[in-house]
Amino acid sequence: MELTEFEARVIGCLLEKEVTTPDQYPLSLNALTLACNQKSSREPVMSLTESQVQASLDELAKKRLVSEQSGFGSRVVKYKHRFCNTEFSELQFSSAELSLICLLLLRGPQTPGELKSRSQRLHEFSHVSEVEHCLYSLSQSDKPHVAMLAREPNKREHRYIELFSHGVSEALTLAADTQHQRPPQTPHLSSRTNVDNSYESDERFTQLEGRINQLEQQVASLEAKLLGLLSNT
């Protein structure tokens, strides 16, 4: 599977809205364009036109990754993904795995701490170690879905990247690197203190991220209400 940057954004938005605003899903072209161009929870922020989103939908339809839905008394065509977790999909993800894939599609490379703090509306992780285990599982499948990037200078955590929207050679290189990744250790009660100390700086960062996410969620809630008003236009 090879997605362009725009196609990855479209799939990410459909995955996100299916979970966070199920009453407004599937999405009309207008609503999907607004979702793609959200100022919050997107990196990079885009300014796609409806024509560009429609072109991406057409290509995704050829790849059998989206489908149209119409009727029910409305003339507006709406779109839903077939990317994963449907009877037509080869990919089947748990709620935890889906949340991480969605975030990586929408926001690019991220650390486990960032993913934990940003995933609350999609899936609730109780600890960073749960995110790490999930990422490890996604990196070790027959066809790896994520890969661990080299640690940036002066950074504690590695960042992870999704492998659906990147070049084959790059993906193979990154995937090969993850084969040498050791599975994260599950913390035991007897070592809880050491684990907590190990993640102390990550938790401080997570607290700051949480405050930012509260503001982002308020913005996202307002955007969701706007999508609801425009979904039938």
Curated annotation (Swiss-Prot):
Residues 178-204 are annotated as: Disordered. Pfam families: DUF480. Residues 178-198 have a biased composition (Polar residues). Signal peptide: none annotated. It comes from the Bacteria. Belongs to the UPF0502 family. This is UPF0502 protein Sden_2282. It comes from Shewanella denitrificans (strain OS217 / ATCC BAA-1090 / DSM 15013).
